A protein has these predicted regions:
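C-terminal structural segments of small proteins and small subunits
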Residues: 67-92
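Short S/T/G/P-rich N-terminal loop/turn motif that feeds into the first structured element of a domain
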Residues: 1-55, 62-68, 72, 95-97
Length: 97
């Protein structure tokens, strides 16, 4: 079975306390679906080909369906509510090869 991934790029963060509240709720919600954080890049980032230096998070799930279910879960919705408008993000759910 192909794995599923969340690829999240933070375009801007306007409320660090909202982001911390989001992370406190999102992490256990993601892990309850077997999600594993591959990177939470706040350190070294090298960009190429018109890329933007954005905080990027990659989470791996055992399947695309689990990745989608985690995003649609009640626990993760509560995390999104805590984040509110504290960050502008590009959030993608993709299937591995």
């Amino acid at each position: 079975m192909k794995k599923g991934y969340w690829v999240v790029a933070y375009r801007s963060i306007s409320d660090e306390s909202a982001l911390r509240a989001y992370a406190a709720l999102a992490t256990p919600a993601i892990q309850s679906f077997g999600g594993r954080f591959l990177t939470r890049s706040t350190g070294r980032i090298e960009v190429h080909e018109a890329g933007l230096r954005l905080r990027t998070v990659v989470v791996e799930f055992d399947s695309y369906d689990k990745a989608l279910a985690a995003y649609e879960s009640e626990a993760y919705r509560k995390a999104l509510q805590a984040l509110g408008s504290g960050a502008e993000r590009d959030h993608r759910i993709v299937e591995g090869v």
